[in-house]
């Protein structure tokens, strides 16, 4: 079980065509934060590779007083941006609150093509509502990706992040 403000995974092996990161029971120390990720190309630092993304969400309040979605989150997508990519936003930090989801990253070892990804996360959001967030895009780089960082926009988190290689 990981506890901290960020988790970095380094892999210099090109064994797999796809990597799947399974994030389970991610719990935030502070409410209202975003769970995010970014990558580094081999030999680079800063976790600020150029990325183009799209993101949408759905949610439903516990007391059935409101639903929303699917809603496109224009303020959270990027067009050749370098910021961290939002996986889940406005998290709750109640004792029973957490988020879980999966990140799929394709062809990270390629030195010819851009690197596509898609994600799906679900969990408890602020104001007692459940949410589901979908993000997709590509890293506009042709160098091999060898590092990925998961982090919270502010504060710490704990949870389990597992990496699987898919041939």
Please describe what each predicted stretch is:
Residues 5-6, 10-167:
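Surface-exposed molecular-recognition determinants
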């Amino acid at each position: 079980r990981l506890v901290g403000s960020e988790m970095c995974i380094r892999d210099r092996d090109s064994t797999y065509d796809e990597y799947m990161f399974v994030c389970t029971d991610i719990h935030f120390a502070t409410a209202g934060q975003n769970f995010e990720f970014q990558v580094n190309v081999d030999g680079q630092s800063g976790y600020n590779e150029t990325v183009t993304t799209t993101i949408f969400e759905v949610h439903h309040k516990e007391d059935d007083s409101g639903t929303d979605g699917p809603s496109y989150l224009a303020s959270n997508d990027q067009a050749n941006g370098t910021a961290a990519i939002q996986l889940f936003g406005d998290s709750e930090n109640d004792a029973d609150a957490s988020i879980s989801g999966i990140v799929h990253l394709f062809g990270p070892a390629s030195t010819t093509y851009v690197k596509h990804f898609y994600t799906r996360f679900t969990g408890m959001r602020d104001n007692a509502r459940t949410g589901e967030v979908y993000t997709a895009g590509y890293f506009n780089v042709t160098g091999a990706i060898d590092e990925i960082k998961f982090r919270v926009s502010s504060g710490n988190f704990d949870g389990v992040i597992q990496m699987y290689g898919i041939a």
